[in-house]
Amino acid sequence: LNIVCRLYQKLLKTYGKQGWWPVIRGSSIQYHPGDYSIPNSEEERFQIAIGAILTQNTNWKNAEKALLNLYTARLLAPEKLAKASEYEIAALIRPSGYYNQKTRKIKEFVMHYGCLDEKEKIDSLREFLLSIRGLGPETADSIILYAFKKPIFVIDAYTRRFCAAHNLKTSGDYDDYREFFEKSLRKDHRIFNEYHALIVRWGKESKSTNHNFS
């Protein structure tokens, strides 16, 4: 096994399956460790996509509060968000921070959401998502991996820190890091899903970049 695969096994042994991306069931956010069939409805797919926008520049707990506010207000659907005023959306997603910017991003996203097709290939989906104002590579790839269950590796600040801590990679742009992981692993959305979630868990648990599994 290469070092990237060995590290994955160590993370999995240490932290267990993470159950990402969490979805709303009943009136609470629920994780689903080991169940990679989720999302298994259009409603859950949309939840994940909106969650990926809300978690930009904040932690998941803040994004979670904003997502639940939209759900409680019965606005967590493309047609309802399209009709809602920016003022109403901004007030509900305030816990996620940058709420005015995120409101505009959500409005822009729902305008295009109906054009997204799960049957599209990854490159086509990614190109389309990146053409939507307010969606960068991390958000687009999170939607592709977690909402559409397609094998693309998500890169974030935790991933870069993880790479530095384990001497895997110390420089490069977003796609350099993404391709590094994708070439080192079997192309399976379940592995990419779990590995990224485990790296996020590692990032939250570790106190410094010197905390490693080597």
Annotated model-derived regions:
Residues 60, 75, 149-153, 168-171, ...:
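Alpha-helix boundary/capping and short turn/kink residues
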Residues 76-77, 119-122, 169-177:
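Short, charged, surface-exposed loops that flank catalytic or proteolytic processing sites
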Residues 112, 149, 161-168, 183-187, ...:
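Short basic/hydrophobic patches in alpha-helices and adjacent helix-turn junctions
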Residues 68, 127, 157-160, 179, ...:
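A generic structural signal for well-ordered alpha-helical surface patches
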Residues 82-85, 89-90, 129, 173-185:
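Short, well-structured alpha-helical segments that form the helix of a local strand-helix-strand
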Residues 51-54, 106, 121-169:
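Catalytic DNA-binding helix-loop module of base-excision-repair DNA glycosylases/AP lyases
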Residues 1-119, 187-191, 195-214:
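N-terminal polyanion-binding entry modules of DNA glycosylases/AP lyases
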